């Protein structure tokens, strides 16, 4: 572990702090073209910083996300309320042995679970649930060895089988935009008919096409990533015959520009199965 980069900073609880320094640029005809101009998670320095932040957060009981350690926990009230609702509806009628199952696809080192676990601790409550993070090999393997708990487990995207398990909630936080074929993944998720799908920190714009560009991260999180900017109209049309929109909201990252004349906003939404 000596080769890990120790985060030399903490940032306080300021909304949109990460996104203010991020930049979207370019317009690419396909994913491979954008990927060839990006560093992505394959950059060893980025991976090391993510690992180091996760270990610091675990040791010091702090919140972390995207390789950044925060001074204060960043709670997701929409997600935490959803989990409570799902447990009451899906589990309580069947007794304490019924486990609420949550799939966190592309969930990094489990920061969403970390804030949820702290949320439970704040109120001195607990219930029977499992939280599975699915990530690329290098993240999943590290998580299994260093971050996993009784409630939190990690699986590799390469080995993950959508058909193997049924989930009550699927969490997609800052995930879909970084997948080469996001709607193929959504198709597989919807085939399993989870009760709820939680989407957050995802970029949308009002145009009619899904755009591909590059997200250049800030100086604290070096690197760049190919990313989708989804057409909000097309996205809603994809879901509307399969699920019902429960709520949609603006994410903390807020507004952004991805060309001189085009802008978008990071949004979140919760869909439920009737």
Predicted regions and their residues:
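Conserved acidic residues
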Residues: 100, 168, 195
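A short SAM/SAH-binding and catalytic strip from SAM-dependent methyltransferases
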Residues: 168-182
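Class I SAM-dependent methyltransferase SAM/SAH-binding core
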Residues: 109-156
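Conserved beta-strand signature within the Rossmann-like core of class I S-adenosyl-L-methionine
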Residues: 193-207
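Conserved class I S-adenosyl-L-methionine
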Residues: 99-109
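Short conserved loop adjoining the S-adenosyl-L-methionine
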Residues: 161-165
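N-terminal accessory regions of S-adenosyl-L-methionine
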Residues: 1-101, 212-226, 231-232, 236-274
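A short, conserved alpha-helix within the catalytic core of class I
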Residues: 178-192
């Amino acid at each position: 572990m000596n080769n890990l980069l120790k985060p030399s900073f903490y940032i306080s609880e300021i909304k949109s702090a990460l996104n203010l320094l991020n930049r979207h640029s370019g317009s690419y005809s396909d994913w491979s073209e954008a990927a060839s101009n990006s560093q992505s998670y394959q950059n060893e320095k980025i991976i090391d910083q993510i690992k180091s932040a996760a270990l610091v957060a675990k040791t010091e009981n702090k919140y972390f996300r995207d390789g950044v350690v925060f001074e204060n926990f960043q709670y997701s009230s929409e997600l935490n309320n959803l989990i409570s609702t799902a447990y009451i509806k899906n589990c309580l009628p069947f007794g304490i042995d019924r486990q609420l199952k949550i799939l966190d696809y592309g969930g990094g080192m489990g920061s969403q679970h970390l804030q949820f676990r702290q949320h439970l601790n704040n109120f001195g409550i607990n219930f029977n649930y499992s939280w599975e993070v699915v990530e690329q090999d290098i993240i999943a393997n590290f998580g299994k060895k260093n971050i996993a708990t009784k409630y939190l487990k990690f699986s590799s995207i390469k080995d993950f089988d959508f058909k193997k398990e049924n989930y009550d909630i699927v969490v997609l936080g800052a995930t879909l935009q970084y997948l080469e074929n996001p709607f193929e993944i959504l198709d597989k998720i919807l085939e399993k008919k989870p009760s709820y799908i939680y989407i957050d920190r995802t970029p949308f714009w009002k145009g009619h096409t899904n755009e591909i560009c590059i997200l250049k991260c800030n100086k604290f999180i070096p690197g760049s990533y190919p990313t989708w900017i989804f057409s909000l109209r097309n996205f809603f049309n994809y879901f509307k015959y399969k699920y019902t929109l429960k709520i949609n909201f603006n994410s903390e990252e807020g507004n952004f520009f991805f060309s001189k004349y085009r802008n978008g906003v990071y949004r979140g939404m919760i869909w439920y199965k009737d």
